[in-house]
């Protein structure tokens, strides 16, 4: 039946069983008998339903220039290794700079020399200052230095990279809490954003990553990368329908390719059409 075809299509895009069933149930309740038999009409109804589900979590990050007496905004970026976290920071730094904001970067992923070098090369290319220390140094002290420096220079926004914490390493999770404690000594309101960077291809595993990081440090937003190619990231629907703690965690940006311009604000309509295009009924 048409409904079964749609169900299969949703599962193919990594929406996950539980969320797929909820979507199909809602679709059945909404659609009249005629629509249920008509694949094109059903498809249209599905598209509207999916967009609605995502609209609640689509919230791009708006950063205002700093008021004269205000402290810099401090954004932490967290996530496991290999999700494109450092690249995301570089792209966001450029985006903010293009909006006329002054930006500073902190190379807090002190475990990987490559991460520090990568951030420094972004800094050179975009003419943005980068605070770094030797590999293996304490990332909390990098963050502390960076916040001090950002406050002294009066920048608008400081973007802090952190180690790619593997889920099993509880000491790395403790370290996240430590970085937060240290930064609060300089500004009680900091960090103003804690953004988890997720790889769009990990499917349902993304939910456990969100849960885990959110327990260590309350998340304020997600960036979902690697949505080019085969990863369909239907998992966003599962994220959109789950509350972590008391809130749903907004999707700030999505990464659809390697280019600097490929970090985009998350727009549900465009995302849903792209997702369904691959499954379009003939």
PLM region spans:
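Short beta-strand segments
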Residues: 78-79, 161, 197, 255
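Short acidic/polar alpha-helix capping motifs at helix-coil junctions
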Residues: 82, 110, 172-176
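Primarily NTPase-proximal linker/entry elements flanking Walker-type ATP/GTP-binding cores
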Residues: 1-108, 115-160
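Conserved catalytic-core segment of NTP-binding enzymes
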Residues: 116-119, 135-153, 167-277
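Acidic active-site catalytic centers that drive phospho-/nucleotidyl reactions
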Residues: 14, 109, 161, 199, ...
């Amino acid at each position: 039946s048409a409904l079964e075809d749609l169900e299969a299509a949703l599962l193919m895009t990594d929406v996950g069983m539980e969320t797929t069933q909820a979507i199909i149930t809602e679709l059945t309740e909404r659609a009249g008998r005629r629509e249920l038999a008509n694949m094109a009409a059903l498809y249209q109804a599905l598209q509207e339903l999916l967009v609605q589900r995502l609209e609640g979590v689509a919230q791009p990050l708006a950063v205002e220039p700093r008021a004269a007496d205000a402290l810099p905004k401090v954004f932490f970026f967290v996530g496991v290794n290999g999700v494109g976290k450092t690249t995301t920071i570089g792209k966001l730094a450029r985006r903010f700079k293009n909006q006329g904001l002054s930006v500073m970067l902190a190379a807090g992923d002190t475990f990987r020399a490559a991460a520090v070098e990568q951030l420094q090369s972004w800094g050179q290319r975009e003419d943005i200052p980068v605070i770094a220390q030797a590999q293996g140094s304490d990332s909390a002290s990098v963050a502390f230095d960076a916040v001090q420096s950002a406050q002294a220079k009066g920048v608008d926004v400081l973007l802090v990279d952190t180690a790619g914490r593997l889920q099993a390493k509880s000491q790395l999770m403790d370290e996240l809490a430590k970085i937060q404690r240290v930064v609060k000594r300089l500004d009680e309101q900091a960090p103003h954003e804690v953004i988890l960077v997720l790889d769009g291809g990990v499917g349902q595993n993304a939910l456990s990553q969100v849960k885990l990081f959110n327990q260590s440090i309350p998340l304020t937003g997600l960036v979902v990368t690697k949505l080019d190619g085969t990863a369909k990231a239907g998992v966003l629907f599962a994220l959109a329908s789950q509350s972590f703690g008391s809130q749903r965690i907004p999707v700030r940006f999505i990464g659809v390719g390697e280019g600097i311009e490929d970090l985009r604000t998350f727009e549900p309509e465009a995302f849903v059409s792209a997702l369904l295009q691959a499954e379009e009924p003939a």
